[in-house]
């Protein structure tokens, strides 16, 4: 498994994504319910363990106590480094209901990369700035951690680069179909997404690379291998332990 260094931290090229763990399928309510029923703490830990066994050393998730507890147990069991990329996404996984609360939680629990979620940075704005983002990035850096944002929009990446916010990495959707999430209203083309990823030297953490299960790994991962920069990371989610093993076996041949 290739590795990528950001700042003083070294991450596996592939990250373990967690949307399925929390019942976020971006497909249907029935699949959401199926995932919620399947993924108790033991099954989540088993799936992450499969990733660890395949050389993955990083988990990407929204901030919540459940994932922090599971990661702590896995660190104790494996006696190995296990990085955490945590976002301030506000959802049903936690009672925390503000991005500031989520950020404080991530800093307290030493998330290697603290990610300000698209819910915050993609909000409509009357000017070119993103209110409060500079202070949040400074707070993350003052804690000795890496700062990221997640965004669905090309224009948000371009805005952050123009404003010089000091962001270390961007979580950003890229796949061969252009899928972002159901009912997404943005008009970016796949080529425009590729252009911003390749045009910005900073590392991206590419998400939705299989379009939330709509693209087979045998098609989606080669596309990412051809389009991503050498310093970009890829977050992959899995619906089961065996699915993790299958996808990571293919990824190991590509990355």
Located regions from the model:
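N-terminal binding-site loop/beta-alpha segment at the start of enzyme catalytic domains
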Residues: 1-76, 220-223
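N-terminal-biased segments
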Residues: 1-10, 88-101, 105-110, 149
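Structural preference for beta-strand elements that scaffold enzyme active sites
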Residues: 3-5, 11-15, 57-58, 81-85, ...
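Short, acidic/polar
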Residues: 33, 38-51, 94-107, 153-159, ...
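Acidic (Asp/Glu)-rich catalytic clusters
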Residues: 53, 70-81, 100-110, 161-165, ...
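Short acidic, glycine/proline-enriched helix-loop-strand junctions
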Residues: 68-87, 135-136, 143-145, 202
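Beta/alpha (TIM)-barrel catalytic core signal, keyed to glycine-rich beta->alpha loops juxtaposed to Asp/Glu
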Residues: 90-95, 119-255
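Active-site gating/metal-coordination segments in enzymes
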Residues: 99-128
């Amino acid at each position: 498994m290739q590795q990528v260094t950001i700042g003083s931290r070294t991450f596996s090229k592939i990250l373990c994504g967690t949307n399925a763990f929390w019942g976020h399928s971006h497909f249907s309510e029935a699949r959401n319910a199926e995932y919620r029923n399947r993924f108790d703490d033991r099954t989540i830990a088993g799936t992450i363990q499969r990733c660890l066994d395949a050389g993955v050393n990083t988990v990407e998730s929204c901030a919540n106590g459940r994932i922090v507890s599971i990661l702590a147990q896995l660190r104790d069991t494996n006696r190995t480094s296990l990085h955490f990329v945590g976002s301030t996404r506000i959802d049903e996984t936690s009672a925390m209901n503000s991005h500031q609360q989520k950020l404080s939680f991530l800093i307290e629990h030493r998330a290697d990369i603290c990610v300000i979620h698209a819910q915050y940075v993609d909000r409509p704005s009357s000017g070119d700035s993103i209110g409060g983002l500079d202070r949040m990035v400074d707070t993350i850096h003052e804690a000795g951690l890496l700062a990221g944002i997640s965004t669905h929009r090309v224009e948000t990446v371009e805005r952050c680069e123009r404003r010089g916010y000091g962001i270390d990495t961007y979580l950003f959707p890229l796949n061969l179909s252009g899928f972002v999430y159901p009912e997404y209203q943005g008009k970016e083309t796949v080529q425009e997404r590729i252009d911003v990823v390749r045009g910005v030297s900073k590392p991206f953490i590419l998400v939705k690379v299989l379009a939330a299960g709509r693209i087979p790994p045998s098609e989606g991962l080669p596309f990412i291998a051809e389009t991503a920069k050498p310093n970009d990371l890829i977050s992959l989610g899995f619906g089961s332990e065996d699915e993790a093993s299958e996808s990571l076996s293919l990824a190991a041949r590509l990355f």
